[in-house]
Amino acid sequence: MREPGSERVQTWLAAQDAKACAISDWVFTEFSSALSIKLRNGQLAEAHRATALANFTMLATQRFAVLPVERQHFRAAARFADQHALGLRSGDALHLAVCADQGATLCTLDRRMAQAAKALGLMTEVP
């Protein structure tokens, strides 16, 4: 299942140091949700969903540092979401809160999220 920008992201990831990249525990929820939506909409077969989920889980645990999502991240995400002009969805606000807490650079293909991150003073990279 190829998404727009998949090859560009794969090339970018391959060039990164093995443990220099991190994701939060929230990414597991978002990935599972995205696969379930595609399954419900008929864009993905159950067997492909299971394979994609297994591959993602293996990649995520072997290639990335996994950051916990804690109470303070939800509170910070709410403060970010309160800034209505940023146009943040709750999940994106949570990603940004974890990035802000860790002093991490956000890597995303979502231009709106990247703009919001910059407005909040976070470093961003768009592969």
Residue ranges: model-predicted function:
Residues I23-T29, G91-L94:
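Aromatic- and histidine-enriched alpha-helix N-cap/loop-to-helix transition segments
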Residues W26, L53-H84:
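Acidic catalytic patch
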Residues S33-R40, D101:
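Short glycine/serine- and small hydrophobic-enriched flexible loop segments
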